[in-house]
Amino acid sequence: MNFIEDLKWRGALNQVTDEAGLIEAMASGEIGAYVGTDPTADSLHLGHLIPFMVLKRFQNAGGKAVIIIGGATGAIGDPRPTTERQLLSPEQLRQNEKGITEQVTKLFGDEKTAIVNNNDWLGKLTLTDFLRDYGKLFSINVMLKKDVVASRLETGISFTEFTYQILQGIDYHELWRRHNVQLQIGGSDQWGNITSGIDLIHSIEGNNATAFGLTIPLMTDSSGKKFGKSEGNAIWLNPEKTSPYTFYQFWYNQSDEDVVKYLKYFTFLGVDEINNLEQEAKNNPGGRIAQKRLAQEVTKFVHGEQAVADAEKLSAALFSGDVANLSAADIADAFGGVPSFDITSEKKNVVDFLVDGEVEKSKRQAREDVTNGAITISGEKVTDVNFEIDPTKHYDGEFVLVRRGKKKYFLGKVK
């Protein structure tokens, strides 16, 4: 399969301006494709991974991957369908640019990759030059019809955000000129901005200039929810914001209805292997064989093989209940979302500990659960109601992990 056929099979193609022309251009020699991202945060998240997966496939097909960090456009903000974006300070933008650049470098490597900042050319563009060289090439009537602009006309859109599509068009032309970029990749909501860039290239370079646009379908799960969040929280690519274990678990916990779609889109596995995993999922529903492979592949791509090994080691320990030898970092990682309570480092009777931490509603219930073997403290079952808990001896003196019954966890945090 060629690049386009592969995208179609993977469900990763929404629109393309000239399919035959793009295939011909890719076959004729190395061309570049680009994805742009504005540094609105200090880390990429799963939403960014959607266009980056297509760009990585383009790179694997022999093309050059170009990533724009929007140092200039990030100071303005791509228009939202409903409200104006909050502007960031120059200092915050620079910090965000640094974090995103490090992540992109890890994903794409150094070969056949260019990471550029549009502040290098937009930052030097005077208002007079902008109006004379570019403004005259854009029709207000056409710009008003772009979906994201049209949706804001009633509620109001600033001139700043209105001109964003011109700046994105300038980006495409600059990359066309500097890096032989002939393809822009974006989400389905970027179609208007992408075609504006193609029109600008044709206006400046002539209608024979080869420039293409490709958009990706909106990614949703089987229930129709927008992909990329876990219980309302963004899944970040920065391991300090979303740990590799949490990242791994996000993929492992995908439903049987979604897993094949995500295997196609977010991994580089071939047709036969994915078809085999799909068949295994059908033959053994709930077995999570396909989910495990999905989690392994995506975690390896983003965080590396060691992160996969560490995540699976932690998962195995949690599944078996053998948590006594985990590190404090592992405990914070795996149990950060369970009910928690503050404790001191001083010793305390287990019954008082359970009641004070609201693990148990009464001392009577606490004594009963301890006596019946329903209470486990940091991996060790406690059956003596006179047992004293010494927080300094648990997980580097940072946590005490309580399990009531088989699955109900609570975390005491030393303050």
Swiss-Prot record:
NCBIfam families: tyrS (TIGR00234). It is found in: Cytoplasm. Signal peptide: none annotated. A motif ('HIGH' region) lies at residues 39-48. Catalyzes the attachment of tyrosine to tRNA(Tyr) in a two-step reaction: tyrosine is first activated by ATP to form Tyr-AMP and then transferred to the acceptor end of tRNA(Tyr). Its EC number is 6.1.1.1. GO terms for molecular function: ATP binding; RNA binding; tyrosine-tRNA ligase activity. This is Tyrosine--tRNA ligase. HAMAP family: Tyr_tRNA_synth_type1 (MF_02006). Its main location: cytoplasm. Keywords: Aminoacyl-tRNA synthetase, ATP-binding, Cytoplasm, Ligase, Nucleotide-binding, Protein biosynthesis, RNA-binding. GO terms for cellular component: cytosol. InterPro entries: aa-tRNA-synth_I_CS, aa-tRNA-synth_Ic, Rossmann-like_a/b/a_fold, S4_RNA-bd_sf, SYY-like_C, Tyr-tRNA-ligase, Tyr-tRNA-ligase_bac-type, Tyr-tRNA-ligase_bac_1. Gene3D superfamilies: HUPs, RNA-binding S4 domain, Tyrosyl-Transfer RNA Synthetase. Residues 348-415 form the S4 RNA-binding domain. Homodimer. It catalyses: tRNA(Tyr) + L-tyrosine + ATP = L-tyrosyl-tRNA(Tyr) + AMP + diphosphate + H(+). Belongs to the class-I aminoacyl-tRNA synthetase family. TyrS type 1 subfamily. ATP binds at residue 229. The keyword Aminoacyl-tRNA synthetase applies. GO terms for biological process: tyrosyl-tRNA aminoacylation. Coiled coil: none annotated.
